[in-house]
Amino acid sequence: MKTAEAQAPAVDAVIFKKEKRKRLLIKLIQQKYLYLMILPGCIYFLLFKYVPMWGIVIAFQDYQPFLGILGSEWVGLKHFIRLFTEPTFFLLLKNTLVLFALNLAIFFPVPILLALLLNEVRIALFKKFVQTLIYIPHFMSWVIVVSLSFVLLTVDGGLINELIVFFGGEKINFLLNEEWFRPLYILQVIWREAGWSTIIYLAAITAVDPQLYEAAKMDGAGRLRQMWHITLPAIKSVIVVLLILKIGDTLELGFEHVYLLLNATNREVAEIFDTYVYTAGLKQGQFSYSTAVGVFKAAVGLILVMLANRLAKKFGEEGIY
């Protein structure tokens, strides 16, 4: 009798597990089309994001292409020590952090402001037109964006310089003046990317209950107060998530954009880790060293995301995990 009583909980546990598996299987069958929809994305991340992580090990090797990963000599932290003792390390760090600060302080609030303003537009056709207009640049490559800037800003025949001369000023060499590199960089980022983030915020705003605005109007609240007390709090969680992800890109500003603007006259303010990795890795063939720089950037980004996420949760926000 005692043996049967002792075995009862174990039998119940087995039955519970079987029922749980059965429910899971039924749920998978019911949602099979949803899983099929996300399958291509999962395959993409597996092949192009996770499998290449195997290459991280060459950051700890003196990698030789002919010997391969398994045949190359292990050197430990040699390449990381070289990076931190490199004379240009602090220059690269400074330039990267300055551009990131500009992104965070100037670019990040722009889509929020645009979304708030577009939400107040009552003419639907005009609203859609503006949304399309600011979103189109996102589909242009940085090559096209920078090329358009060159056409507008060139000293001889550039529209901007022609206007400056027309109003009595002197021509400015925007492209070869290091003082203009950062303003040009951030203006191009705003023009190309602001529309994408604006769409995200607008989607979040659509979830706000219209009755809240009606109640605010009855209480005498104007549009500015409605924005401040209703719309902004409603999209606060989205802002926090995008801010955390943005902080994770502190050292990841994007190679292509900066490299297209980089030249001999502005290198002191334009050289960042991304362009440095390209020069060391592809131009000079220092594969292990350039990988070590990439690992350093990824580690910093991961730490900052974790810290930002913890800070967000400390202040009562959801965070990203």
Swiss-Prot record:
Domain of life of the native organism: Bacteria
User: PROSITE patterns in the record, alphabetically?
Assistant: ABC_TM1
Q: Where in the cell is it found?
A: Cell membrane
Q: Where is the ABC transmembrane type-1 domain?
A: 1-144
The family database entries (SUPFAM superfamilies) matched by this protein are listed as: MetI-like
- What Pfam families does the record tag this protein with? BPD_transp_1
Keyword Cell membrane set for record? yes
GO CC annotation: plasma membrane
Task: Explain what induces or represses this protein's expression.
Answer: Up-regulated by growth on type I rhamnogalacturonan.
Q: What's any GO biological process attached to this entry?
A: transmembrane transport
Residue ranges spanning the membrane: these are 21-41, 63-83, 123-143
Q: How does this chain sit within the bilayer? A: Multi-pass membrane protein
| Chief location | membrane
Which family does the record claim for this protein? Belongs to the binding-protein-dependent transport system permease family.
- PANTHER family the record matches: POLYGALACTURONAN_RHAMNOGALACTURONAN TRANSPORT SYSTEM PERMEASE PROTEIN YTEP, PROTEIN LPLB
Per its record, how is this protein called by name?
A: Polygalacturonan/rhamnogalacturonan transport system permease protein YteP
